[in-house]
């Protein structure tokens, strides 16, 4: 999901 991708680059 969108948030998933965001957490991936975290």
From Swiss-Prot:
Key words of the record: Amidation, Neuropeptide, Secreted
GO CC terms, sorted: extracellular region
Location of Methionine amide modifications: 10
InterPro entries hit by this protein: Tachy_Neuro_lke_CS
Gene Ontology annotations of biological process type: neuropeptide signaling pathway
Signal sequence, start to end: none
Keyword check for Lipid metabolism: no
Subcellular location: Secreted
Function: Tachykinins are active peptides which excite neurons, evoke behavioral responses, are potent vasodilators and secretagogues, and contract (directly or indirectly) many smooth muscles.
Family (UniProt): Belongs to the tachykinin family.
Name assigned to this protein: Neurokinin-A
Organism: Gallus gallus (Chicken)
């Amino acid at each position: 999901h969108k948030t998933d991708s965001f957490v991936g680059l975290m």
